[in-house]
Structure formats: structure tokens, C-alpha cells
């Protein structure tokens, strides 16, 4: 008997070096079924363009494999280091692009 009944959600904790990914499936009642967790990593020494491309490819692969109904992304918050915020903002843009093309 299939216990999945609701939305499948791709959760994203955005980052350029490490981007957290998870898939959960709504089950019967108020249950949430974990499906997959992972981290998309990009090499720190690679160019910004290469890193963003790798991140885009990783996210589109997850979307293709798990076919989520919706994407939920953690909101970007300032931690005091401007360059970190800017790099994460670039990653967020690529993640939104990948999700919008699914």
C-alpha cells in the first residue's frame, strides 16, 4: 500500500561551496516521509562561472530524478561577510532559474 499522498518538496539550503538538498514527501495524515538528502559541492578554486554551472547541473539533476511538486528555499540572510552574501546570492539566482525551468 502506498503511503504517499501529498506534495513532494525539494528543500534547498543555498550556498555556492555547499548547497544542502532534501526531498520530502507528504504522507497520510500529517506525516512527512524523508526521501533523499544530499549536498551539491563546488570547488572553491574554480571560476565563478564554472561553479554556478556545476550548481545548476546538480539542481536540475535532482529535479529530474525526484520530480518535486514545489521547491522551498531558505531565505538568504546577512552574516557580516559581504563576499559570502554576494556569492550565495549568485547561487540563489541559479537555483531559482533551474527551478523555474522544471
Walk through the language-model features, giving the residues of each.
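Phosphate- and other anionic-substrate recognition elements at nucleic-acid/protein interfaces
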Residues: 1-102
